[in-house]
Amino acid sequence: MLNRRNFIRTTSALAASTALPGYAFGQSGPLRLEITEGVIEPLPFALPTFLAVGGAEDAAADVSRVIAADLRGTGLFRQIPPDAYISQITNFGAPVAYPDWQAINAQALITGQVEARADGQLVVRFRLFDVFSQAPLGEGLQFVGPADSWRRMAHTVADQVYSRITGEGGYFDTRVAFIAEEGPKNARLKRLAIMDYDGANVQFLTDSRSIVLAPRFSPQGDRILYTSYESGFPQVYIMDVATVQRRPLEAIPAETMTFSPRFSPSGQSVVFSLVDGSNTDIYSLDLATGTRRQLTQAPSIETAPSFSPDGSQIVFESDRSGNQQIYIMPADGGEARRVSAGTGRYGTPVWSPRGDYIAFTKQENGRFHIGVMRTDGSDERLLTSSFLDEGPTWAPNGRVIMFTRETPGDDGAPAVYSVDISGRNLQRVATPGMASDPAWSPLQS
């Protein structure tokens, strides 16, 4: 077994954004934060609390706080304390006093307004400025939604800011499925749960009467695959996130052990591991027709399949060479090639949404690591090292990874951590107690 944990594993509501009427902003200025492997000096930004209209003071403060937290949390941005500001924003459409922001070394300025409408809708408007070029950075936008969607609108603004400055897609308006755990290590209760990427808005999707493991989002974010022991043995279930209705995968013989599921990029089929006698192989299942197909046939354990973004290939782990290694095969099965080339044991491979890297868990010399490698096995880099790090999951922009970290000892507690693909900005993700097996959703908007 690759891991130390005691379970089977071998290893809404927002309207469309619109350009603000009356603001015909020009082309983006030269401000650009390049994401490289070198030392990064966080980009200083100023974010005055958004103006409030119609009694939206609390919402304006909350939206501003979440946007700032999103940007700071990347490790790429540094917020200049508001008490250092020389200028005060009193009119959303007023000209920017660039010299005042240059004087405090702000490189980016984010201004905004939150309006509470009589119909219960909330309108969030924002503008982004390149301070030293003295020019807007892209168009001003507004987002409209129910008042209780303010957090999503804040994340969406942060995604826009992140994207315009880095040139990469954002990842803030996302959710994370995970396993919420409680109780002693030898009798731990597990529930499937979902939350915003920053730990807010936690919702429990199952009770704790049976063990649940390994949730995986569909490409559309509307369904979750996971493994449950509610029948007494591991079986893959599929759940509708909106209704919380669940069912086991169809066309699977009764009392057949299935686990380690993953959706295809189209969401129309799934792959998973199935135990048949003494052998464990990878199968695919067409969700519309129920057609099941065996993809591997080696006399070994094949598991943890993950599709390439274009759906043409599957990366998986196998012990066919004597210990666990990473292999790639065509999506319809066929000859597999080994891509892991280092020492140690490799498992839980996951293809990056960008298609450029494969993330994995590695065990070597009594330590566990989260690492990345190119899809041909080259450029292997270990991003973390601890008593137990496992189960990477990619942010939708392919630049940040979440994973499970567990502390040693009889009371070892699992927690969710994140790290960027250069190994920087390692931090614990807020969860309501112990948590494991994170799975990142696609962007919601």
Swiss-Prot record:
<protein>
    <recommendedName>
        <fullName>Tol-Pal system protein TolB</fullName>
    </recommendedName>
</protein>
<keyword id="KW-0131">Cell cycle</keyword>
<dbReference type="InterPro" id="IPR011659">
    <property type="entry name" value="PD40"/>
</dbReference>
<comment type="subunit">
    <text>The Tol-Pal system is composed of five core proteins: the inner membrane proteins TolA, TolQ and TolR, the periplasmic protein TolB and the outer membrane protein Pal. They form a network linking the inner and outer membranes and the peptidoglycan layer.</text>
</comment>
<dbReference type="InterPro" id="IPR007195">
    <property type="entry name" value="TolB_N"/>
</dbReference>
<dbReference type="InterPro" id="IPR014167">
    <property type="entry name" value="Tol-Pal_TolB"/>
</dbReference>
<comment type="similarity">
    <text>Belongs to the TolB family.</text>
</comment>
<dbReference type="GO" id="GO:0042597">
    <property type="term" value="C:periplasmic space"/>
</dbReference>
<dbReference type="Pfam" id="PF04052">
    <property type="entry name" value="TolB_N"/>
</dbReference>
<dbReference type="Pfam" id="PF07676">
    <property type="entry name" value="PD40"/>
</dbReference>
<dbReference type="InterPro" id="IPR006311">
    <property type="entry name" value="TAT_signal"/>
</dbReference>
<dbReference type="GO" id="GO:0051301">
    <property type="term" value="P:cell division"/>
</dbReference>
<dbReference type="GO" id="GO:0017038">
    <property type="term" value="P:protein import"/>
</dbReference>
<comment type="function">
    <text>Part of the Tol-Pal system, which plays a role in outer membrane invagination during cell division and is important for maintaining outer membrane integrity.</text>
</comment>
<dbReference type="InterPro" id="IPR011042">
    <property type="entry name" value="6-blade_b-propeller_TolB-like"/>
</dbReference>
<feature type="signal peptide">
    <location>
        <begin position="1"/>
        <end position="26"/>
    </location>
</feature>
<keyword id="KW-0732">Signal</keyword>
<keyword id="KW-0574">Periplasm</keyword>
<keyword id="KW-0132">Cell division</keyword>
